[in-house]
Amino acid sequence: MAYEFEPRILGFLCNWCCYAGADLAGVSRYQYPTNMRIIRVMCSGRVDPAFILRAFSNGMDGVFVGGCWLGECHYVTEGNNEAFSVMHICKKLLKLIGVNPERLRLEWVSASQGIRFAEVITDFIKELKELGPLGTGEGIDTNGLKLKFEAVQSLVPYIKLVERERLRVHFETEDEYDKFFNSEEVDRLFRELIVDKLAISEILLLLRERPLSTGEISEILDLSPSEVSRYLNSSAKEGLVRFDEIQKCFVPA
């Protein structure tokens, strides 16, 4: 009998709308797969990037966030608008480390939309089955995937600072959010503020395991030797790494 992959999903559901919609789906006996484990949150805006990244690093094949429709948040802070921004940023981070961003999904479900909840969960699970297990579907080995998630998780406080200072916006429609976060300006900010930090974080994690030469780091991270040298020189100036003359390798400072 052929093995059929069943994705593991972690869902963060807004207490007031999506969670109530899920409850209605159950009471109404709408049929949908039971692959998702649910965490109820008071607002989708309270879902921290660290929660999402931790879920993936712990082996979840997909993460689902469900909230109120835009303009219908139960709080004056309009947390679902913030959730929309966080989702865009997390999708960019996943893409940056080689993970398919479609493994993360945000949907709006009201308390009266039990049938919609069943439909979006069924569709999400179908999509994840097509993508395959986390890592395997992307062609990333287990150790490489672990390294990438550890590196990006270590940057979460910095990423949240970047979001607050440079990427925090408030729009009325989804199209406006999509246009902003898919713009060349935001892509440029990501390259300038996050890409280098992530590469340095990966290098530091590797050096904690064992001393490595520039060539070895280049091969492991699939970076050019010149890029690795630039990152190592920058890290050395900050007192993070040093060159060991005896071993002829770089080690943590």
Please describe what each predicted stretch is.
Residues M1-N233:
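Iron-sulfur-associated redox domains of electron-transfer enzymes in respiratory
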Residues A236-Q247:
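A short, conserved structural fragment
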